[in-house]
Amino acid sequence: MIFLSHFSNLGDPVLLMAFLAFVLILVSLPFSFWSLSSNSNSSLVRLLIGVANLVLAFQLCTRWFLSGHFPVSNLYESLCFLTWTSTLVQLIIERRYLNPIIPAILTPFSLLTISFASFALPGELQIAGPLVPALRSSWLVMHVSVIMCSYSALLLGSLLSLAVLILSNSNELQIRGSSLGIGAYRTSNSTKSGYVNSRSLQQLFSNEENLDNLSYQTITVGFLLLTLGLVSGAVWANEAWGSWWSWDPKETWALISWLVYAAYLHARITRGWQGRKPAMIATFGFLIIVICYIGVNLLGVGLHSYGWFLS
């Protein structure tokens, strides 16, 4: 079995550090849920995620040193890089808004990505190999790192939007302030009895409002990075293959992702949408990014594939 075979490869320092990061994130997960249930912030969770982030940074640097190239040449390396950027984005978000709901939402995503890299991929895909000629370019660091950072920001921002949908629970919620400000929610629905606990309602709306604002800001950063990544990728493609755009499956899905999040930002900035409506668009964008990043890779098609099933 693929899962069991990986424990015999822990003599590799790169794989060992990835496993250590997995353990740290795994241990932090129940504490994240406990903090959420008790409505208390856990410094232990932030410490564990911070240490995992440092371990992954050291792991990537070690792979870079051993392989001689930027560590994003296959699906394993890119998943480790995605986990590193995701934990970093989580720590940055928690500095802006310290609330137990943040790690409870975002930690499972980092655990999923590092678990997939460590246990789901075959051993031969975890080994660093030589770069293909097209990747031997200074654009590798610029383009791929920016794209991966954009994926992290967009995916985590979309998860925050999903949390808004879950917390609002089908109520029509609106924010009286702007997307960048801190306003107050109002609901079009009332309870059947006409009585609402003001303390719990204020706390719920405050969480939703802050999550909505954080999602908007995080997705905005991710969208700008994705735009920069697409432009740099087009320049690199022209140098490598003589064409700015070849409608490769990865390029096509990246463009679809860009259009979805452009629609999200347009709805918020131009139409003034806030709360559930843009959150639905962002949640749909999450699925598109997953298809763009994982789906295309695992099918093993196109110039950008780090495929496994069919390669």
From Swiss-Prot:
Keywords assigned: Cytochrome c-type biogenesis, Membrane, Thylakoid, Transmembrane, Transmembrane helix
One of the record's GO cellular component terms: plasma membrane-derived thylakoid membrane
Keyword Thylakoid tagged: yes
Membrane-traversing stretches: 14-34, 47-67, 70-92, 101-121, 146-166, 218-238, 252-269, 281-301
SS bond list: none
GO BP annotations, alphabetical order: cytochrome complex assembly
Single annotated GO MF: heme binding
HAMAP family: CytC_CcsA
Function of the protein: Required during biogenesis of c-type cytochromes (cytochrome c6 and cytochrome f) at the step of heme attachment.
Xref: PANTHER family: CYTOCHROME B_B6 PROTEIN-RELATED, HEME EXPORTER PROTEIN C
Subunit text: May interact with ccs1.
Protein family per UniProt: Belongs to the CcmF/CycK/Ccl1/NrfE/CcsA family.
Listed name of the protein: Cytochrome c biogenesis protein CcsA
Species per Swiss-Prot/TrEMBL record: Prochlorococcus marinus (strain MIT 9211)
Name of the gene encoding the protein in the UniProt record: ccsA
